Amino acid sequence: MACQKFIVGVIGLIWYNRCMMTGNKLLNPDHILKEIVEIPYGSTVADLGCGAMAFVSLAAAKIVGDQGTVYACDILKDVLSSVEAKARQAGLYNLKTVWTNLEIVGATKIPQEVDYTFLSTTLFQAKNHQAMFKEAYRLTKPGGQLMVIEWKASSGPIGPAQELRVAKEKALSLAQQVGFSLVKEFEASDSHYGLLFKK
């Protein structure tokens, strides 16, 4: 049974990555950043757990412009190298890659003055969710916002195994425990929920 769940999860992630790379996106970063979060030019953004494709980081770097900064943070150094190459190819010199372990509070070495912090499809890959929310809170400046996007509890075979997914109610509780206040909930896609918080 465990093997079957693992295989389903792997197949789902492969399908997900293929969709994202071919443009048939499950998530639309531009819509989320411009229409839901409404990130303005010149903002500072931290994408915690950016991943190899770095959809949030790359989209944010285009929006915030030369006067803004985007920190693409991840624990895998090869991922960061890939993201940096994509940014340079796109001429996005305001994007900076940062190695970190998000499950250790204080490990992310960037200024604690982030306007918009993102935890996007990252929680399901981790164990210490509380530490991740504490780190997000530490980095976000007073009045700044946190965006959480995660897989819905039951969204079919696409994505990670069900037992790895973090329910919306749990994410909401964890964020509020560290001091964030909920601004709004939204449908990030048919397969993802979204939560927007303010510090």
Locate the predicted segments by residue.
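Short, positively charged and aromatic/hydrophobic N-terminal segments
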Residues: Y16-N17
